[in-house]
Amino acid sequence: MKQNNVFFRYFSPVAAQQKLYVAALVALLSSSAYKAEAQVGEPFIHDPSTIALCDGKYYTFGTGEGGLWSEDGWTWQGGAVRPGRGAAPDVLKIGDRYLVAYSATGGGLGGNHRGDVLTMWNKTLDPKSPDFKYTKPIVVASSLDDEDCDAIDAGLLLDPTTGRLWLSYGTYFGFIRLVELDPKTGKRMEGNEPVNIAIDCEATDLIYRTTKDISTFLQSKFLRNHIIANHPSVAFEH
């Protein structure tokens, strides 16, 4: 689980039907004795993204259009807006804008492996704001019908030590891949080719860690495995 004073990603143990249960990490737990509780109500969300803070409210997006929002991190309701439909989005604040990544995919077991990961920007996540307007989606990664990879389950990471922006993608039946994006445009860096960094992981995510000798790692949402690297651009190890 990624967490800091702005956002964290929730990892559900059940992929087919994910409901968002937020355990009061919004304020960052300072004591292990704090008792975690489920959020109020029963809003449904599939493949929830990182939770992003925008103008005092919290937003998360899921597969299909839309998502949830909350004023306190406990009580959630529908109303977040994300066009493009697609699957398994992620959201990251960069400067004063929000970058959203999502996938348009053939669907693995139910279809083929043809897919795209797209990115788009918005100045705000509040659909009632006059500044609310998504930019045109841009394809930043793709997979073909017969590839051992599906361009799905995007995970964004802005390296706080270098300012470089990374995107991981892939799923349970093939390679997990990594590409570098331009943090100013959201496009893939010119000449940057995908790198295979893992295999057969479900819905991975890139997470920054400040331990002694590990700066980043790639982790499955289902917490079955993780791999680590001193930097996203170098080899990962189990």
Model-derived features: where do they sit?
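Carbohydrate-active catalytic/glycan-binding domains of CAZyme proteins
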Residues: 36-238
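Compositionally biased, low-complexity segments
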Residues: 8, 26-28, 229
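Compositionally biased, intrinsically disordered low-complexity regions
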Residues: 12, 28, 234-235
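Glycine-centered signal
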Residues: 14-15, 31-35
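N-terminal secretory signal peptides that target proteins for export/translocation
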Residues: 1-17
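Bacterial N-terminal signal peptides
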Residues: 19-31
